[in-house]
């Protein structure tokens, strides 16, 4: 029971909160704030200082797993605060279904992070996927949201079939669904069955799809464009971090030193993601679609760290995805504070000249863009430097050069945002009331981007 206490706690918070919200509909805001407070307290339940594998060696706990879960939950809480303040800003009633879906999605991520066999991993990933489809289509009166969610659901269902097909291959040719058994066969067996390799590749396709890495990235621009901004902050932070940790587990606990998958396959996907993400964003005018391609690009960078055969590679990748999650949240909260209910229409045209009327927000967006480019001494520079340094240190020159090249290409459209704000003709934007939750998040992002490098170094 104690083994799955965080998962049970979050499930109860989600379900009981939903029941109270239905019974006392005029108190949704109070219930919502109580649930956020309970989620903050739940962070402490994720820490387990002793490593243990229970439920027939299928579910693991430990200090590293606890830290991973607490990071994911922390970013989830930020997304919930953004949704609350966004609803207040546009004068819309809080829909408690949003918090229920997100918390159940997090339970799925927690299960996936702790799982040590394929069936449990599949169940966790599918719980996350099903709730994500609903979050993508949460704007019921918006045809773009429904279209994006439908595309996401159809493609996600196809990838689910592939992952199940992969599990059947793994069990059929490997004789087990336990991670340790498959790891032993891949790393200690001179005659590896091709069916086992096919099964692992098919299962990996579902991870790459959820990460939006190329060539399984085509869903993400439409989903980002149609999804509510609060859902996007969750997709681009907590959900992505969770899936990166799951990929780490698969790379370390299943594939191990079997280089045809753990090196060649992931290397190709990393290069494709960097190239598609960098060049795909150049022609975009919508800022939400721009960030979708930016996600593809940055997932490509994260995969560089996954490929590297040492612990430093994993640290570099995890650090980079954390920095990117913070940067993305900062950017989207700035857009909410600028445009309110018109945030979905945010584009290069609508941000023209905002530096004249919204100096603070324009400055923060500029810092976010400079951090994404990797300009020192911002934290984004440190993340890229550490990642590329580790790649060069392990003789991965192709990946490092591709990363540097695509960073230069991406600088074009990141600087284009700054140019539109400071050097273009002014557009009139109505000043919106201050939401202190969003303001606090923005200031924390600013502190992290300016001083995060020094905190990490020391």
From Swiss-Prot:
Its EC number is 7.1.1.-. GO terms for cellular component: plasma membrane. The keyword Cell inner membrane applies. InterPro entries: NADH-Q_OxRdtase_suN/2, ND/Mrp_TM. Pfam families: Proton_antipo_M. GO terms for biological process: ATP synthesis coupled electron transport. Keywords: Cell inner membrane, Cell membrane, Membrane, NAD, Quinone, Translocase, Transmembrane, Transmembrane helix, Transport, Ubiquinone. The chain crosses the membrane at residues 2-22, 30-50, 62-82, 93-113, 118-138, 153-173, 196-216, 235-255, 261-281, 290-310, 319-339, 361-381, 397-417, 438-458. It is found in: Cell inner membrane. It is a multi-pass membrane protein. It catalyses: a quinone + NADH + 5 H(+)(in) = a quinol + NAD(+) + 4 H(+)(out). GO terms for molecular function: NADH dehydrogenase (ubiquinone) activity; NADH:ubiquinone reductase (non-electrogenic) activity; quinone binding. Belongs to the complex I subunit 2 family. NDH-1 shuttles electrons from NADH, via FMN and iron-sulfur (Fe-S) centers, to quinones in the respiratory chain. The immediate electron acceptor for the enzyme in this species is believed to be ubiquinone. Couples the redox reaction to proton translocation (for every two electrons transferred, four hydrogen ions are translocated across the cytoplasmic membrane), and thus conserves the redox energy in a proton gradient. NDH-1 is composed of 14 different subunits. Subunits NuoA, H, J, K, L, M, N constitute the membrane sector of the complex. NCBIfam families: NDH_I_N, PRK05777.2-5. This is NADH-quinone oxidoreductase subunit N. The lineage of its organism: Bacteria, Pseudomonadati, Pseudomonadota, Alphaproteobacteria, Rickettsiales.
């Amino acid at each position: 029971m104690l083994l799955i206490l965080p998962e049970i706690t979050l499930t109860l918070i989600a379900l009981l909160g939903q029941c109270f919200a239905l019974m006392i509909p005029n108190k949704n805001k109070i219930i919502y704030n109580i649930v956020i407070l309970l989620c903050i307290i739940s962070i402490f339940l994720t820490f387990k200082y002793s490593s243990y594998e229970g439920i027939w060696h299928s579910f693991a706990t430990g200090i590293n797993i606890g830290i991973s879960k607490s990071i994911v939950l922390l970013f989830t809480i930020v997304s919930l605060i953004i949704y609350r303040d966004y609803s207040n800003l546009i004068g819309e009633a809080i829909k408690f279904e949003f918090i229920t879906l997100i918390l159940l999605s997090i339970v799925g991520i927690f299960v996936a992070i702790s799982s040590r066999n394929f069936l449990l991993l599949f169940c966790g990933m599918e719980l996350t996927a099903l709730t994500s489809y609903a979050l993508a289509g949460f704007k019921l009166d918006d045809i773009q949201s429904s279209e994006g969610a439908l595309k996401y659901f159809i493609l996600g269902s196809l990838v689910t079939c592939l992952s199940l097909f992969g599990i059947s291959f793994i069990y059929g040719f490997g004789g087990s669904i336990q991670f340790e058994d498959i790891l032993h066969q891949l790393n200690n067996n001179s005659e590896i069955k091709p069916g086992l390799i096919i099964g692992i590749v098919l299962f990996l396709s579902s991870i790459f799809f959820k990460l939006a890495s190329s060539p399984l990235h085509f869903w993400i621009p439409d989903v980002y464009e149609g999804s509510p901004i609060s859902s996007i902050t969750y997709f681009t932070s907590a959900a992505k971090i969770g899936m990166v940790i799951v990929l780490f587990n698969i790379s370390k606990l299943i594939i191990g030193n079997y280089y045809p998958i753990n090196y060649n396959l992931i290397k190709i996907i990393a290069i494709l993601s960097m190239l598609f993400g960098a060049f795909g964003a150049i022609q975009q005018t919508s800022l939400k679609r721009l960030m979708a391609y930016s996600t593809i690009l940055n997932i490509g960078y994260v995969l560089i760290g996954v490929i590297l055969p040492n612990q430093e590679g994993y640290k570099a990748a995890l650090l980079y995805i954390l920095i990117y999650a913070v940067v993305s949240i900062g950017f989207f909260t700035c857009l909410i504070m600028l445009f309110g209910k018109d945030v979905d229409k945010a584009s290069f045209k609508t941000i023209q000249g905002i530096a004249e009327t919204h100096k603070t927000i324009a400055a923060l967006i500029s810092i976010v863009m400079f951090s994404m480019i990797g300009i020192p001494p911002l934290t984004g520079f440190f993340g890229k430097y550490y990642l590329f340094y580790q790649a060069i240190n392990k003789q991965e020159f192709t990946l490092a050069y591709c990363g540097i090249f695509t960073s230069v290409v991406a600088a074009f459209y990141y600087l284009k945002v700054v140019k539109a704000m400071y050097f273009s003709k002014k557009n009139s934007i109505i000043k919106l009331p201050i939401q202190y939750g969003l303001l606090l998040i923005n200031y924390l992002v600013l502190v992290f981007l300016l001083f995060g490098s020094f905190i990490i170094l020391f």
